[in-house]
A protein has these predicted regions:
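Conserved core positions of repeat-based scaffolds
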Residues: 31, 68-71, 80, 122-126, ...
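Bacterial signal peptide processing site
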Residues: 15-17
Length: 390
């Protein structure tokens, strides 16, 4: 059983009130859902938010992997919590799991600037202030671009001047020098090289137009994507349920264009298994579009029918979404006022509604306000409060 929880990070004491010399209060982490460990019989069921101690400093970014959560603070430190058997906590230890956040141990002088989001399923990636990438955790498929099977502390990848990174169950993607690189398993063409060959070293993705820069990378279990500065979005990899969004169900080892309305602002891929996955895209007008597997209602269009082309999510009247995220069989959005909405599968409480509803095919209010949301598989983290950057 993997560690599954929904977490809410509540940032306190970071407003403009009080003396300017006062340090920000520590971040408080809450979790609920099912907490367990791989292969463990016992598990902890939490149906109400429960604090997780340990994070110190002002959190500026959050990220999730299959069984872990990560928080980057304004000082460049990274904190981790969750399953630790593969070294995912990055502190040299590997207990079953940790419900308390622990500090990831980078070499002296390394200051992290951003986290991959989502993270590799059983590992983690972070970009430092110099553009170097660090990875830790499980590297069984070469998806961390490292040579070892497991890394219990961060190791530097053979990449530099990296601006973006994202990970999944089988592979990772990086943007540097105007190009996109990938490593890991090449099954279904997920590396985007034109073949299904695997590579434990970074290889260039082929077929992306060079007329616009890459502004975001997306990934799911066996899918990849890139959003360009002109609003064009491209997918590649597995496609049996229409995950590529191009009107086909044929896999593609090269990027294919997804026909979306103008004004795409954010895209997020989800999926927790080798044969599922969905993608959410949010436009400047607040509308949300989704495509791919829909067996649990995760597309949010009121049905449970998969789609190989983008469909419009049934957004409640008067609500404008500004951020989206997508996990295993569930999807999430934050509206203009900060309210969190969720839809899809809820068997592990990952919708966070506290209700007995097992499936929601349209967005439902979670009853909490957030500024950031991240989800991977059944693991969700949210940040509440002001930060120094989005």
């Amino acid at each position: 059983m993997a560690l599954v929880f929904v977490a809410v990070l509540v940032l306190t004491g970071c407003g403009s009130g009080g003396a300017s010399s006062q340090a920000p209060s520590a971040t408080v982490l809450y979790r609920f859902g099912v907490v367990g460990n791989r292969g463990a019989i016992s598990q902890l069921q939490l149906d109400r938010p429960t604090p997780v101690p340990g994070i110190s400093g002002q959190v500026v970014q959050i990220a999730t992997s299959n069984s872990d959560g990560y928080a980057l603070t304004s000082s460049g430190a990274v904190w981790a919590w969750g399953v630790a058997s593969y070294g995912e906590l990055g502190n040299g230890e590997h207990p079953a799991y940790s419900t308390r956040a622990v500090k990831v141990e980078f070499p002296s002088g390394v200051r992290i600037a951003s986290l991959a989001n989502p993270m590799p399923f059983d590992g983690a990636l972070a970009i430092d202030s110099q553009g170097h990438v660090w990875g830790w955790g499980l590297n069984a498929l070469g998806d961390l671009c490292l040579s070892g099977l497991m890394e219990f502390r961060p190791s530097e990848l053979p990449l530099s001047k990296v601006t973006l990174a994202t990970g999944a169950r089988t592979h990772s993607l990086f943007s540097l020098g105007g190009k996109v690189y990938a490593c890991g398993s090449g099954e279904y063409g997920v590396l985007g090289t034109g073949s299904t060959a695997s590579s434990s070293t970074p290889v260039p993705v082929v077929g992306l137009p060079n007329t616009a820069r890459v502004t975001a990378l997306t990934s799911s279990w066996e899918g990849s994507g890139a959003l360009l500065s002109n609003g064009d979005y491209f997918n590649w990899g597995y496609n049996a349920a229409g995950q590529l969004g191009n009107g086909s169900t044929a896999d593609s080892a090269v990027p294919v264009h997804v026909d979306l309305p103008a004004g795409v602002r954010q895209v997020f891929q989800g999926g927790s298994g080798p044969k599922n996955g969905q993608t959410m895209a949010i436009l400047a007008d607040g509308s949300v579009w989704a495509w791919g597997e829909n067996g649990r209602g995760q597309l949010g269009d009121g049905t449970r029918v998969s789609s190989d082309v983008p469909l419009r999510v049934e957004v409640p009247h008067g609500v404008t979404f500004v951020k989206v995220s997508s996990g295993g069989y569930a999807s999430y959005a934050i509206d203009r006022s900060g309210r969190l909405w969720a839809w899809g599968d809820n068997k592990s409480g990952q919708l966070g509604t506290g209700s007995g509803t097992t499936i929601a095919t349209e967005p439902v209010s979670v009853g909490i306000r957030l500024t950031q949301i991240s989800s991977t598989a059944q693991n969700v983290a949210g940040l509440q409060g002001s930060t120094r950057r989005p």
